[in-house]
């Protein structure tokens, strides 16, 4: 008896939205504005996602990265720093952001060019199959920086979250 064929792979996203946040660590550590008001463990309709997001003005107004990466897509489009249809363009944006932030990284370990080359290779790979990229670094002083590239239309983790640009 033969095994059934594997399911088809999820569709590739039509584009990626890019987000960057830099701020105080204590702001980043306060999770109250980083999550929508209801824990959702399954996919729901696009309309239900919008209702959940609208029920939390603090979540919608916060530019601090959400706890779940696809939840960026629930926030207003004005928070998007860039949008790319091609994964290589989204990866180049990520590299540029990390390179810009690198002199401010707290640790020499994170400033290491070989380590960063590994991050960039992983980003290229992840975007190549339709995934998201998430990077976060402690900065000198009391800062924290986050750079995220989020697949959209659909996102693999939350395919029913609607695009914030529509």
Roles of regions detected by a PLM:
Residues 66-73, 84, 123, 133:
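Residue-level detector of functional hotspots within protein domains
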């Amino acid at each position: 008896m033969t095994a059934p064929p594997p399911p088809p792979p999820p569709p590739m996203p039509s584009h990626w939205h890019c987000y960057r946040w830099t701020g105080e660590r204590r702001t980043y550590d306060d999770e109250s504005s980083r999550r929508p008001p209801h824990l959702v463990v399954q996919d729901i309709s696009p309309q239900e996602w919008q209702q959940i997001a609208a029920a939390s003005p603090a979540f919608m107004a916060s530019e601090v990265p959400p706890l779940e990466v696809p939840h960026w897509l629930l926030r207003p489009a004005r928070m998007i720093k860039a949008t790319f249809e091609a994964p290589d363009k989204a990866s180049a944006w990520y590299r540029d952001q990390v390179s810009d932030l690198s002199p401010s990284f707290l640790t020499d370990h994170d400033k290491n060019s070989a380590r960063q080359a590994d991050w960039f290779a992983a980003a290229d790979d992840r975007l190549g199959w339709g995934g998201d990229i998430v990077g976060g670094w402690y900065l000198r002083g009391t800062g924290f920086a986050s750079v995220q590239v989020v697949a959209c239309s659909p996102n693999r983790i939350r395919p029913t979250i609607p695009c914030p640009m529509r």
